[in-house]
Every structure is written in structure tokens, then in C-alpha cells.
């Protein structure tokens, strides 16, 4: 037992040193935090509400990251001190507590090692994530709602802010379409691995004959981009429609045509937003999404061109089936791109195992995304 702990401690110390040296840079983050906090107390800081909001979010994120790093560093030091104390290290109750500390530290190191795989130009950005029901009717709409729950729990575990941008409920149950905005560092870097078709196999609760059904839902992920990235959208290339926002009812459902849908003719891209209170705000949000979708399409075309010359490397097939979720006759979740699989489907649907699938994807595909 003691030898096992010693080996695990050695790996933790190596991981902590590598994280500090090549990724985290706590000194740099502390300096950035001081500079931003100085800006935040200057007169007129809130004159530009958008800029001030972004700086405030960055300050909160830096504080959280530094807190997490210091917590990890302190826990590793405590483990090291414990193992050097021969009397304490023989105590069985203390060993149980030590195991919990090891699991916590190892999980955190693994999370930060995953960040080292996120080197794309937009990986640090927030993102939009859309889920659309495919073939399967009500069953597929229910599948969208199940995936939504999984992604919301997963995003919450990363401390990202979740905004519902657009939603269309199913006629009987579930959701036909939903778009989320995940706000936080590396949201796009992680979530981009989820783009593609997700296949569900289960005995449908909507079938009185209890037959097994196969349903599909597609997931699209595209990064939020700032004004520094130029995307040309000519007025004559778009059509703007307004409509009454939908919802489950109650005081927050608009009674005016405040929801906005924009169609971009050259690409066929359609975006919509009903989250904001006014038509002007929804229109602005739609334009931001449209810019992001068009830019993502340009990136995809560039990657597809690069894939022509990658005969010895795996290709990225946009919109293809990426993962199977089998509930009956056995339980299995398998990624068809990487071969990574787990049998605990409930933990997967609770968002607890998604990071492992994403890391496997990034290891195999990270350099070409």
C-alpha cells in the first residue's frame, strides 16, 4: 500500500510541475489579475458595459483558477507530509482519507493535462452548442432532452455559464431543437469534440409494445468570435424574420414578435434567438451567431482541404455519426471515432464520463482541429 502511494505521489509531483511549467503559469495569472483589478476600480469602468462584463468574468475565472491551483498544491504537500510520517501512514482510517485526496488530485491533474491538448486558435473561446432531433419522431425529441441534461450537467461541472438561446419543444414530448451558449474558458475546445450525430438504442417508453427503437440527434458546436475576426455579411445576402417566442407558458413568454430568425442565402445557414427580452437584442444575438457559424464553415472547409493531404492520418467527417448509446439489450456507450467505450451509461448521461471521451478524441484528433 505504502509503495503504491509513493509511486502515485511521484506521478502527482511530476504532473504538478509540468502543469505549472507548460500550462498554468500561476505567476502570470496573478499579474494579469492585478492588472484587471486595477482597471475595474477606475472611473468610467462601467461606461462600456460589454467590455466591463468580460473583464469581470475574466477576473472571476482567474481567481477560481488560482484558488484551484493553490488547493491542489496544498493537497499534494499534505499527502507528501503524511507519507513521510511513519506513524500516521500506518493508520487505516488515515489511509482511507489519503485515498480520497489522491483521487481528487489525480482527477484535477488529468483535467489540466487535457487543457494541454487544446491549442487551437479558438479553443479558449466560449461556444454555441445546438442539438437537433433526427429520425425517430417523439423518441428523437426525447433523446434531445436527454442529451441536453447531459451537456448541462457537464458544463456546470466546468463552472461555465449556460444560456438557452433558442428552443423548440416537441409536439408530444421532448425537444425538437435547442441552442445553448456555454460561456467560459475552453468551452469550445472541449465541446467541439461533440459535433456529429449521436445514436440512441433503447426500448422506447412511448411504444406500448415495448419494442427496441433507434433514434438520432445531431449536435453542432461553433465558437463565439469577437469583432477582431472579420466576417463579411452583406445586407442583400440575408433575410430577417420575426415571430412570437415560444415556451412553456407563464409571465416570461413574449406576446409580441420579439424572436428573430436570420437566413444567410449563400451558405444556407439559419440562426434564431428568442432568449432576449427585445427584438433588437435578439437580432444582435442572431447576428453574432451567424458570424460564428459562417466562420466555423470557413474553418471546416479549410480542414477538409488539409485532409486531402493527410493520407496517413484520420479524417474529420463533419455531420457523421460519432457515438452510440445502447441502453438495451446491454448498456454501452462507444465513440466510433476513437473506439473509447464505457458500460456505465447512467454515469455518462449524468455528464460524469464525458470528459474521458473528449480527451480520447483530442489525443487522436487534436492536432487537426
UniProtKB/Swiss-Prot annotation:
**GO biological process, alphabetically ordered:** viral translational frameshifting
Question: Where are the coiled-coil regions?
Answer: none
GO MF term set? translation release factor activity, codon specific
Q: Cross-referenced InterPro entries, in alphabetical order?
A: PCRF, Pep_chain_release_fac_I, Pep_chain_release_fac_I_sf, PrfB
Query: Where does this one sit in the cell?
Result: Cytoplasm
What more does the record tell us? The gene for this protein contains a UGA in-frame termination codon after Leu-23; a naturally occurring frameshift enables complete translation of RF-2. This provides a mechanism for the protein to regulate its own production.
The name this protein goes by in its record: Peptide chain release factor 2
Organism, by scientific name, is Chlamydia trachomatis serovar D (strain ATCC VR-885 / DSM 19411 / UW-3/Cx)
Organism lineage string: Bacteria, Pseudomonadati, Chlamydiota, Chlamydiia, Chlamydiales
Q: Give the gene name.
A: prfB
